[in-house]
C-alpha cells in the first residue's frame, strides 16, 4: 500500500522468483493484498484490493500502520475458501527466492506456526529492554485469558508468517493484545511480538530463514530497489514465463565493495 513504487516492484519481483519453483501441478495460489490492483493485472495472481477506509481502520487512523499486517492476514483468510488442510504463507514485499520455498509449507503444521526468525529471548537482549520496562509484573486481560510477559517470551521476525486455518483466532487475540501494547509499550515491533505471543499459547513455532532471501535493511533497500526497477522496466512486457526465468538471474546481494562504500558514505553524511 502507499505511494512508494519500490514496494510494488518488490512484490512483483518476489512473486516472480517464487513462481520459478512452483510447478503447474503444485496446489499453490498466490494472493496479493494491495491498494493498487492495477499494478498486478498482468500477473497470474489473485488480487484483493484494500480500500482507503480499510487502511484507516486497520491502522487505527494512522496511529500504528504495522497493524495493517495483522488485519490484512485476517482479512485474506476470511475471504479465501480455505479447507482445514490449507497452509497460508504470508510474505513481505522485500523477499525473494533463489532456492525453492516449497519446503516452507512442510514446516507449517496444525500444531506449528512458521516465522522468519527467532531473534532471541526478550530477557536476553538489551534492545528488547523496553518490553521488560513496560510489561514486567503486569497482567493483561484478553477475552477469558490473562497475558503476562515471561522469561520464555521471544521476539520473532514476521517478514514471513506461516499458519493454518485452525490458527485464525490467534490473529484476533494478537490484535487485542497489540492494541494494549500500542498504549503501553513504545516500540514499533509490537506487531510481530503480539502475534508470536498469541500463537505460542497454543502452538509450537519454527523459523524458515534458510529458505528466503531479503533486503529489509535501509542500505540493502537502497541497493536493491533500483536494480529491481531496472529489471522490471526492461522485462515487464515479456511473457510471464520469460520474466520468471530472467528474475532468477538478477543479483540483489551487495558486493563487499558496495557494502564498504555505503558505510563510508553513511559516515560522511
Question: What spans do the regions from the language model cover?
Answer:
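Long, low-complexity C-terminal extensions of enzymes
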Residues: 222-269
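A conserved donor-nucleotide-binding helix/loop in the catalytic core
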Residues: 56-89, 99, 103, 115-116
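Conserved donor-nucleotide/metal-binding helix-loop-beta segment in metal-dependent transferases, i.e.
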Residues: 96-135
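A structural signal for well-ordered alpha-helical segments within the folded catalytic domains
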Residues: 9-12, 16, 67-71, 189-193, ...
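N-terminal anchoring/stem segment of glycosyltransferases
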Residues: 1-64, 79-84, 168, 259-269
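Extracellular structured ligand-interaction cores
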Residues: 85-92, 155-160
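Short His-Asn-centered micro-motif
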Residues: 1, 32-35, 91-93, 116-118, ...
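Catalytic core and acceptor-binding pocket of nucleotide-sugar-dependent glycosyltransferases
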Residues: 142-234
Amino acid at each position: 500500500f502507499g505511494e512508494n513504487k519500490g514496494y510494488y516492484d518488490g512484490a512483483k519481483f518476489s512473486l516472480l522468483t517464487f513462481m520459478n519453483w512452483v510447478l503447474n501441478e503444485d496446489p499453490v495460489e498466490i494472493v496479493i493484498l494491495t491498494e493498487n490492483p492495477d499494478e498486478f493485472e498482468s500477473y497470474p495472481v489473485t488480487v484483493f484490493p484494500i480500500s482507503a477506509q480499510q487502511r484507516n481502520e486497520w491502522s487505527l487512523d494512522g496511529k500504528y500502520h504495522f497493524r495493517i499486517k495483522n488485519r490484512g492476514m485476517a482479512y485474506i483468510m476470511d475471504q479465501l475458501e480455505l479447507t482445514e488442510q490449507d497452509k497460508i504463507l504470508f510474505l513481505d514485499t522485500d523477499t525473494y527466492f533463489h532456492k525453492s520455498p516449497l519446503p516452507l509449507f512442510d514446516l507449517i503444521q496444525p500444531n506449528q506456526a512458521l516465522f522468519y526468525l527467532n531473534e532471541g529471548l526478550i530477557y536476553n537482549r538489551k534492545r528488547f529492554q523496553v518490553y521488560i520496562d513496560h510489561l514486567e509484573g503486569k497482567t493483561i486481560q484478553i477475552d477469558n485469558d490473562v497475558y503476562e510477559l515471561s522469561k520464555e517470551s521471544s521476539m520473532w521476525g514476521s517478514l514471513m508468517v506461516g499458519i493454518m486455518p485452525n490458527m485464525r483466532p490467534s490473529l484476533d487475540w494478537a490484535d487485542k493484545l497489540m492494541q494494549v501494547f500500542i498504549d503501553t509499550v513504545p516500540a514499533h515491533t509490537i506487531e510481530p511480538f503480539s502475534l508470536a505471543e498469541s500463537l505460542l499459547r497454543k502452538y509450537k513455532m519454527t523459523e524458515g530463514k534458510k529458505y528466503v532471501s531479503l533486503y529489509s535493511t535501509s542500505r540493502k533497500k537502497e541497493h536493491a530497489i533500483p536494480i529491481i526497477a531496472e529489471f522490471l522496466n526492461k522485462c515487464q512486457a515479456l511473457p510471464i514465463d520469460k520474466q520468471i526465468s530472467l528474475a532468477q538471474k538478477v543479483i540483489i546481494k551487495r558486493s563487499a565493495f558496495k557494502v564498504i562504500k555505503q558505510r563510508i558514505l553513511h559516515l560522511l553524511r
